[in-house]
């Protein structure tokens, strides 16, 4: 299921650049989607994952903090592509998480997520982070093309760079497939 948090709010266009909608405002959307999926006879409620990119990745992490932690009630696994982790430093979850970060991301710098993942792993939680050296924000999106693009209104007008990284994208896709197969297969821990 793909959740669209924007159309119901008037078709917001500049969420990431304009700070119009905070990631926490999307948490009820994800929890409502989870509740809906759990009612469907064609969905195994113990095998539901959550996935987000950038602003949606921040909402993903925030949702995990608000969702039930038991796999039979909440999300079994989560994938977060280039989230901004500064706003979730006190966050914890028992849900398995895969974070995919761009080493050269100047929009959502990887450092806070690397620190968070290390701290959570040290606490015994299943959090994996992979940083792709030289990769920018949006590294998995082929529509961005191989040349860097400056987004001048990002970060309150300071600007940020996006760029497709084919090697990083392919590796991240492989890791996502493996991660979801390991955590959503029937009988997985």
Residue ranges of predicted features:
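Short alpha-helix in the alpha/beta-hydrolase fold that links the catalytic acid
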Residues: 95, 109-119, 144
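Serine-hydrolase catalytic machinery in alpha/beta-hydrolase-like enzymes
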Residues: 1-42, 143-162
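Short beta-strand/loop motif that positions the catalytic acidic residue
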Residues: 99-101
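Active-site loop signature of alpha/beta-hydrolase-fold enzymes
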Residues: 8-11, 86, 138
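C-terminal catalytic histidine-bearing segment of alpha/beta-hydrolase fold enzymes
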Residues: 126-189
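Primarily recognizes the serine-hydrolase "nucleophile elbow" in alpha/beta-hydrolase
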Residues: 22-94
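Acidic catalytic loop of the alpha/beta-hydrolase fold
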Residues: 104-108, 137-138
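Active-site loop/turn elements of alpha/beta-hydrolase fold enzymes
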Residues: 3-8, 83, 132-134
């Amino acid at each position: 299921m793909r959740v669209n948090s924007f159309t119901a709010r008037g078709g917001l266009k500049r969420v990431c650049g304009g700070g119009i909608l905070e990631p926490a405002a999307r948490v009820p959307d994800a929890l409502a989607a989870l509740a809906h999926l759990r009612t469907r006879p064609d969905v195994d409620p113990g095998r539901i994952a959550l996935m987000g990119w950038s602003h949606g990745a921040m909402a993903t992490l925030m949702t995990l903090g608000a969702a039930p932690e038991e796999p039979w009630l909440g999300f079994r696994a989560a994938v977060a592509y280039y989230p901004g982790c500064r706003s979730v430093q006190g966050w914890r979850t028992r849900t398995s998480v895969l974070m995919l970060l761009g080493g050269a991301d100047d929009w959502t710098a990887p450092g806070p997520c690397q620190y968070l993942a290390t701290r959570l792993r040290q606490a015994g939680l299943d959090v994996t982070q992979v940083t792709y050296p030289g990769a920018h924000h949006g590294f998995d999106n082929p529509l961005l093309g191989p040349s860097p693009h400056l987004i001048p209104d990002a970060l309150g007008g300071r600007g940020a760079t996006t760029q497709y990284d084919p090697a990083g994208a392919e590796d991240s896709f492989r890791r996502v497939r493996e991660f979801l197969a390991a955590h959503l297969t029937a009988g997985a821990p």
